[in-house]
Amino acid sequence: MKKLEDLKTKIDFTKIISKNKTFRVKFVKQGDVSLSSQEVEPYLGEVIFNQFKGKIKASMDNPDYIVYVYLFNSNCYIGIDYSGFDLSKRDYRVFANPRSYHANINYILLKIAELKETDTLLDLFCLSGETGIEAALYLTKRSPNYFGKKNFAFNKFFKFNFDKVDKEIKKTKSKIVLSSPTMGDVKCAQKNAKIASVEKSIDFTRQDIEWIDFKFKKKESVD
């Protein structure tokens, strides 16, 4: 996409957005892009309005649907925002250590490591506990947004059976150990894990590295 007229999309929004609902357009860009949100948002808004032949309203403050336009160089992506907030954020990070990796980075690393049930996970420098907490959430099938279900944007336009998903939450057979030579880090990790409701799935210990072997049985391996 190089010019504004290219936004005359073939997408039929009448099949995506329900009648008698409100909407707004948000524009995000990266790379070599000359277009601005002041140009793109009203333009696509008018395209959508015309598709509905005026039988839809725009709302800048509290729309039912947010139509996202993401432009990266000449590539344009258009979609509906189902979350309504940044999914990389974690509400449990109340006692955060500035040296910790962001929680979503920890989750990605756990996926790359192919963490699975019955594995043992040890974090020697747990800081504020994100690695172990993300592992516990993943293995117990508990959503990081378990307590924020009502905040999802899709609640405005369709009903989702959260109870069915919550029934999949289980105990994990894995051993997750969060350790640190500093008691302050251990306490922060414990508090964050409690906020995330996974503190019972994690062992917390203040240990110097040279003594950590005593935390595990002789035949027990650490993954």
Annotate the PLM regions.
Residues 220-223:
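Short SAM/SAH-binding signature in class I
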Residues 1-60:
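Non-catalytic nucleic-acid substrate-recognition regions in nucleic-acid-modifying enzymes
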Residues 101-211:
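Conserved S-adenosyl-L-methionine
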Residues 211-218:
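Short conserved loop adjoining the S-adenosyl-L-methionine
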Residues 26-30, 70-72, 207:
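Short loop/turn motifs enriched for small/polar and acidic residues
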Residues 67-83:
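C-terminal edge-of-domain segments
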Residues 54-68, 124-125:
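Short, surface-exposed recognition loops or helix-turn segments adjacent to catalytic cores
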Residues 78-112:
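SAM-dependent Rossmann-like transferase core, predominantly class I methyltransferases
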